[in-house]
Amino acid sequence: MTKVRVRYAPSPTGHLHIGNARTALFNYLFARHNDGEFIIRIEDTDQKRNIEDGEKSQLENLAWLGMEWDESPAHPGEYGPYRQSERKEIYQPLIDQLLSSNRAYKCYCTPEELEAEREAQQARGEMPHYAGTCANLTPSEQAAKEAAGLEPVIRFRVPRNTEYKFDDIVKGEITFESDNIGGDFVIQKRDGMPTYNFAVAVDDHLMKISHVLRGDDHIANTPKQLMIYEAFEWTPPVFGHMTLIINSETGKKLSKRDETILQFIEQYRELGYLPEAMFNFIALLGWSPVGEEEIFSQEDLIKLFDEQRLSKSPAAFDAKKLEWINNQYMKQMDLSELTDMCIPYLVADGRVEENPSPEKIEWLKQLVSLYQPQMSYAAEIVELSNLFFNEHPVLDDAAKEFLQGETVPTVLHAFKEQLEALDVFDVPSIKAAIKAVQKETGVKGKNLFMPIRIAVSGQMHGPELGETIELLGKEKALDHLNKVL
């Protein structure tokens, strides 16, 4: 097998999106599984759309997820530069070669002329395409246009009536007709920068990329890239186009404009998701190993990764499943580490002072331990722990309705008396007090525990009742009870 070299090639036009993170992650797993190399290349030819720190943000978030790369702008190998904007001197001789072999030509059509042509074609019911207006200009005609101040783009001369086939790792054989790709396409813009399809094909060849794994929104680009390979008599890489990611609730393609779902890695970082959990979750977006297991370490995923198991169906992004996976990892965390993760959120909400005392940290450890089994992400500690920081939790309608039960006043008065009598306020004593209430009132089960839980915590469900009351403290627990009574 050819040495595996794959690349993740982001454009610095925004932050790291879930879909782009998946592309990077599958390339990373494929490279590591095959003892290959994982390359970062920055595709920044669209200078107008690039944002400040876009490259830095993307790479920082990839590193946070746990990916390491073998070559990049900051760690160049022998195939640099690794930013397309720095490779113009590499592209230009190849553009000139296509011009001299008549595989490309200068086009002087203005944007206004092209738009008018497109509208006329649509009015005739034709698929928009470049009509070849400048395809056969004589040198004197070209000189006249340049004398008039027109600057050309360079168009690639698309072969007519030609079929292009490739075997896609995910989708099998794919065929394109050259007459259906929109006519001769631009490979160099007026500012001298190459277009995406030209630069990608050249870079993949010169950087010895063996496999190109990317989203299936790139399928339409593949025939254009194959034509460029053909023009230079180069062997193309193996292509694999991963299915789209859809919103599991709407069934629609994940769109950056859909604000009902968080879609950028840094948003999950800010909420206190764990990188290992994110890596695990993203790896299952459009790929699955044999079996039913869903929790995997990075080492497991590298060992198990098989590109033949990439899904042919759209991958459903399920935020609830991500919360579940993150919870599985959080439950296994060292308590001190998890507490350190949670404290900044409590500080930011004004619930805890900065640099809390050792005594306060011990109390916070108990608080975090109480909610660790159910916590989906670190920032959730603020919402989960409301009852410890508010005067009294607000009851919802279901809780209020339950407190209308016939035996509720009896249970709560008895429990209040039991708590007031306690000299030692710890979990065994609190559990003994609840048992004493059961014996005294004859009420048991849900009718015993639920009123106590609602009165003390304001919630119908939650962590262990004894531990909750102990951490709340005798004074506050009695205060909550009195407010309900």
Swiss-Prot record:
SUPFAM superfamilies: An anticodon-binding domain of class I aminoacyl-tRNA synthetases, Nucleotidylyl transferase. It catalyses: tRNA(Glu) + L-glutamate + ATP = L-glutamyl-tRNA(Glu) + AMP + diphosphate. Pfam families: Anticodon_2 (PF19269), tRNA-synt_1c (PF00749). ATP binds at K256. Its EC number is 6.1.1.17. Monomer. Belongs to the class-I aminoacyl-tRNA synthetase family. Glutamate--tRNA ligase type 1 subfamily. This is Glutamate--tRNA ligase. It comes from Enterococcus faecalis (strain ATCC 700802 / V583).
